[in-house]
Amino acid sequence: MRHGYYADTYPMKYRVYRISAAFFLAIALPLFFSNAQKGNSVEEEIIQNETIQMEEIPEIKSEYDGTLLAAETGLYQVKEGMLWPLWTKGSVSRIVKGKSWFFLTSEGVIKSDDLINFEDISEGLPHLTIKRYKDGVKSFENQAAALKDLKMHPQNPDVLVTMTRDEVFITRDGGKKWWSLGFCARTNGAKSIAVANMKDSDGVERLTVFISHPLYGLSYIQPDRKNASWIDITAGFEKLPTMSDPDEIADIVPVCYVDETGNTTTEVYLSQSYIPNIYKLDWDAKKAIKIGEKNAGSNGVGGNSGVELDTIDSLFVDGNTLYFVCRNGFSSFNLGTRQFDGAPEEAELWETLSRLSGRRALCLYIPKGVTKFSKPVTLNEMWLFDMEKPQTQYADVAMDKRGLYIPAGQNNPGSQLQGFIDTAKANGLNTVVVDMKDDYGLLRYKTDNEKVLQKATISSYAIDIEKFIKQCKENGIYLVARIVVFKDRNLWRYDGNKYAIVDYATGEPWRGIRSYDYETDEDGNVLSKTATNYYDENWVDPYCEEVWEYNIDIAKDLVAKGFDEIQFDYIRFPTDGLNLDRVKYRWRDTGMDKESALISFLSYARSNIDAPIGIDIYGQNGWYRSGTRTGQDVELLSPYVDVICPMFYPSHFEQYFLAQTPAVERPYRIYYYGCYRNTVIARNKVIVRPWVQAFYLAVSYDKTYYDKDYVKREIFGVRDAIDRGYMYWNNSGKYDYISPDPGDAEYPY
């Protein structure tokens, strides 16, 4: 992996309290939202806080009545000065109002006519099979597949569209039945969707569904056409320098305008996720027209040149103004003057409402009349309001960790270990990452844990873990235990290859073939081929619950001994081998796929490890909203971990990637943009702590540019984007090219 190239009702008894505005904002609602984590009943929490002098503070005004707030723990409403939980069976991320209410939730699509009775209308939408494993017994849950968005036709409230990461669905009867429209690409990943009637060049209005793909821009389909298929629209959208495809589109909103004669015209507005631009779609020309650019005039180098990383999402049009959610707040754009007007008058109220949750509000619905607008306001992606701190329970523990990797065999307690500790301290670092189960599955520490020892092989170079931990703690070092999970030669061989993935053609344990020798006849026709070279990787089955249990037992053992954090590497499926199409996963249960396997494993890990959990991922999976090839879908995995460590190694990307003039700035750009993109994809649920390339690889860019400044530029890129820590990687343990952490120093180049 290190050198692989990337080409019901409220479930408790409660009283309803008439509450003051201040009490509502500061105490009551956060308690509802945090109740599931803390374990106390809402009634108990409110009673404990009733000492507040509520009579001195005016009650919530009736003008706020009807406001809906969606959160991780459900749906809530302000009514008659009281706080009401409406639906608390899961998280809610979208609120859509037509003739009925529709909600995008973790349980699928939910419908309500009265906000009292709620109906699951997800029949026909896909589900994931999630495996649960406890005390040696496995069970299964049929969990709704993650739905990315939910939109309603602006003229027909019976027509709605939604999508998973690789399939689009439409209903024409208010959710009674969903039809698949397929998908716009072979590569999975999706962000936004929309539906409207669009007038074609022949004068006919046709039902049109739009979708944004993280790699390929905008696509549309007109499902009522004969032999309908997805068509891309790429012209006009901004691309990152050196890239051929548009950067990700964050939101799509069709707006219907009626002229004096009663004719309706539909305009489509769009924004981008990582480049803060606003577009209007020229439907006739099938191209985007850029009408707003927050970073106009920048040269694209990065933060040192004045480029501000920002996101424009959750578009809402009223009159001649487009409102949107952006990093740490709201803003607006005048469609007439094509100027950014800044925060609207209502921003303070919206922001106050957005921060009601003890963790976060995901979505907000404000009825017409509460604000000056001519229609209700719905705001999504409200996690953007609070980008200062990641929303993980271990944020205070795992934030601001800067460290280096100590290779196995070089971390013996005493002078050898002290050398790395001294290097760390001299460079402003406070963390070390060490192999505790290495790339071959060998334990690199001595343990007497009988459960672990049943399957483990302890390396002859295993360290005295107690002495190691003691020495690190005496030096104030934060300890991260790296555990290589599914690439494990020891477990691959165990008990007659019980846990190995197999070659379905031969029935033998599978290994990735790197090359063949071919036998040919005199005309060059291939008669036979023989595998002559294999990848140095032995993969166990990621679907296997006994493999999960073994790795989690090791993690629990290490936490008990004193490690601060567990870091899982090779938390993925194999990606290399000319025979990759012959892999068979014997432990795969019916209905499971790669994503459900990794979710199941990490859910099992989360429920058993009382410490921060980190995962290493390919740089490409941190850059794009897609889990293609590896199953490492950041959106799906981020709820189960605290730290994501993307490997944004410049040497591992295509060598032209972001190498525009001045090419020397490429390492800065990759980490600057990459850290922000990964954080946005994860919706700020995790700490993004990247691996930083502190090694030379004989590729064209490194041959020209690799030096101490190359590594320093990477660190400045991390700092200027989302400054939450980093880790140096050098497989040989040679850190001659690292520099002291820059702190607040000016960018020197």
Which residues does each PLM region occupy?
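Short coil-to-beta transitions that initiate beta-strands within beta-rich domains
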Residues: E45-E63, W84-G98, S122-Q155, G182-K199, ...
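Conserved Ser/Thr-centered positions that define the repeating blades of beta-propeller domains
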Residues: V78, K111-S112, T171-R172, I221-P223, ...
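Substrate-binding cleft of secreted/luminal carbohydrate-active enzymes
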Residues: L384, V641-Q655, V664-Y672, R677, ...
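Active-site-adjacent "subsite" loops/lids of carbohydrate-active enzymes
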Residues: Y394-N412, F486-D557
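Catalytic domains of carbohydrate-active enzymes, especially glycoside hydrolases
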Residues: L417-G441, K561-E565, V643, A721-R724
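Aromatic-lined carbohydrate-binding/catalytic grooves of carbohydrate-active enzymes
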Residues: I421, K425-A462, T575, D581
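Conserved, mostly hydrophobic/aromatic
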Residues: V432, N551, L558, D569, ...
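Aromatic-lined carbohydrate-recognition surfaces of secreted/lumenal glycan-active proteins
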Residues: Y478-D488, Q567-P574, K594-T630, K685-Y696
